[in-house]
């Protein structure tokens, strides 16, 4: 995430488990009035979200932003597709990379920067099952080393 970034609202931890993140991009979100209020309240879920390039625009699908409690008939649809704001060069680069086999555009986190909602979008390659097992083994080994080091420091 770039320097001067603000408060992180939501993270997609599952993305780091299921994908190798090769590049990250910062994208603005086109939102309705009640959506930004729900995001500021922290009521957003990125678990099943993904992004696609369509007609030279990037759209995020399945991102759940809960309805705003005080919003009446003007409330938004929680699962509507939302447009992401990126530079044209970035969109062209993402479109070319996403067409390759095994690559996907995955939302990594939503944060507020200077009052605006931003999304960290990752160009990701899917992990195989053995890659996930290997990562879990490495993580467990690091925990064991840290635990042994802590126990040794106590003595």
Curated annotation (Swiss-Prot):
Role this protein plays? Required for rescue of stalled ribosomes mediated by trans-translation. Binds to transfer-messenger RNA (tmRNA), required for stable association of tmRNA with ribosomes. tmRNA and SmpB together mimic tRNA shape, replacing the anticodon stem-loop with SmpB. tmRNA is encoded by the ssrA gene; the 2 termini fold to resemble tRNA(Ala) and it encodes a 'tag peptide', a short internal open reading frame. During trans-translation Ala-aminoacylated tmRNA acts like a tRNA, entering the A-site of stalled ribosomes, displacing the stalled mRNA.
Protein name, UniProt field: SsrA-binding protein
Signal sequence: where? none
Cellular location of this protein? Cytoplasm
**UniProt-listed InterPro entries:** SmpB, SsrA-bd_prot, SsrA-bd_prot_CS
Quote the gene name from the UniProt entry: smpB
Return any one Pfam family short name: SmpB
> Which protein family is named in the record?
Belongs to the SmpB family.
Alphabetical list of PANTHER family matching this protein: SSRA-BINDING PROTEIN, TMRNA-BINDING COMPONENT OF TRANS-TRANSLATION TAGGING COMPLEX
One biological process term in Gene Ontology: trans-translation
What organism, scientifically named, is this protein from? Bacillus cereus (strain AH187)
Q: Keyword set for this entry? A: Cytoplasm, RNA-binding
Task: Indicate whether Protease appears among the record's keywords.
Answer: no
Q: Which PROSITE patterns match?
A: SSRP
- Supply the CDD domains for this chain: SmpB
For this chain, one GO molecular function annotation is: RNA binding
Q: Name one GO cellular component term.
A: cytosol
